[in-house]
A protein has these predicted regions:
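Cysteine-dense, low-complexity repeat segments
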Residues: 79, 83-89
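Metal-dependent catalytic neighborhoods of phosphoester/phosphodiester hydrolases
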Residues: 16, 40-81, 98-102, 192-203
C-alpha cells in the first residue's frame, strides 16, 4: 500500500494551474492508495458545484460548507478521473484562510469509503478564526484501519496549544485502535528534531513514526527554511529544513520505504511543503 501526505497550500500558490497539473501527473505515476491533503482551499463566494458533478465524493456528516467551482480537491479528483484514475474523495471546509478562502482538508482513496468522520480539535469552533482546527478521517471498505488527515497547532501557542489538540485526537481514536491500525497523516507543526515538544508528545503516547520504521528512507525534510507560520518561531531564519510533515501509525507496521516527494529533485515543487510517500510491506 502506498500512502501520500501533502500540505498543498493549493490556491495560495503562485503558478497554481501549473502546480496542479504537476501534482496530478505525480499521482498518475505513483498511484497512491491513500492521499491525505491539508490546506485544501476554494475561493469564498465562488459558484457552488452541482451535486451530479461531484463524482466520487462522499459527504462528511455535519459538514456545512458547499464545494465550490475552484475547490482544489475537486480539481485533483476530476483531473485524475479524466485521465482514467478513479478516486473516492472527501473534503471538509472549516475556516477562512488568508481572508479569502474556505480552507479545509481532503482525503482521496482508491478503495471505496465505508465510513467518514470529522472532529473538532481546537477549543474554538469559529469559521472566521484561523486557529480553528479539525481532523478528517475515513475507513476503507473491507478494512478495520482508519486514516486521518491532520493539521495541528503549535506546541507553544498560548490559545490553542498542540497538547490539548493531541488529547482530543487520542480520545477520537481510542476505541478504533482496539479493532485495527490508526494512521495519522499530515502537518504536525512540530519539527521531529526538537525534543520535549510535539514530536516527543506523540511518540510518548505509543505511536510509531513510519519514517523510523522504514527499511529505506531519506533525510525526511519536508520544509526548507522558514515558511508561513514559522517565520516568527524559528530563531535562525536561515534554518536549512524541518521534518514537520509526518505519518504515524498506532501499530508497528512494516514500512518498506519512506521518501520525500515533490521537492524539486525527482519531482517538481508544488507547495511550500514537500510531500511524504510511504510504501507498506516487508522489504
Amino acid at each position: 500500500m502506498k500512502i501520500l501526505t501533502l500540505n498543498t497550500h493549493s490556491l495560495q500558490e503562485s503558478y497554481y494551474p501549473e502546480k496542479l497539473e504537476w501534482f496530478v501527473q505525480f499521482v498518475l505515476r505513483e498511484q497512491p492508495d491513500i492521499i491525505a491533503l491539508q490546506e485544501v482551499n476554494q475561493t469564498v463566494g465562488a459558484r457552488r458545484i452541482r451535486a451530479d458533478r461531484l463524482v466520487g465524493m462522499v459527504p462528511v456528516p455535519g459538514a456545512e460548507t458547499p464545494v465550490r467551482e475552484d475547490n482544489h480537491a475537486f480539481a485533483v479528483a476530476n483531473a485524475l478521473r479524466r485521465s482514467g484514475l478513479e478516486y473516492h474523495w472527501v473534503w471538509i471546509g472549516f475556516k477562512i484562510g488568508y481572508d479569502k478562502y474556505d480552507e479545509g482538508m481532503a482525503i482521496l482513496s482508491r478503495q471505496p469509503i465505508a465510513e467518514v468522520e470529522s472532529h473538532l480539535l481546537s477549543s474554538c469552533d469559529d469559521y472566521r478564526n484561523w486557529r480553528t482546527r479539525r481532523v478528517l478521517g475515513f475507513r476503507p471498505v473491507y478494512s478495520t484501519d482508519w486514516f486521518y488527515t491532520v493539521h495541528m497547532g503549535w506546541w507553544q501557542d498560548a490559545e490553542e496549544p498542540f497538547r490539548a489538540q493531541w488529547e482530543r485526537i487520542e480520545a477520537v481514536v481510542r476505541e478504533k485502535k482496539k479493532h485495527g491500525a490508526v494512521w495519522l497523516l499530515g502537518d504536525f507543526n512540530g519539527p521531529a528534531e526538537v525534543r520535549g515538544e510535539s514530536y516527543d508528545c506523540v511518540k510518548a503516547a505509543g505511536w510509531c513514526d513510519t519514517y523510523l520504521l522504514a527499511a529505506d528512507r531519506d533525510d525526511g525534510i519536508t520544509v526548507e527554511g522558514a515558511i508561513d507560520g514559522w517565520r516568527d518561531k524559528v530563531a535562525d531564519q536561515n534554518v536549512s529544513g524541518m521534518r514537520i510533515d509526518q505519518i504515524w501509525c498506532s501499530e508497528k507496521a512494516a514500512i518498506r520505504s519512506s521518501r520525500v516527494v515533490l521537492n524539486g529533485k525527482r519531482d517538481p515543487v508544488v507547495s511550500d511543503h514537500y510531500g511524504i510517500l510511504i510504501e507498506t510491506g516487508e522489504q
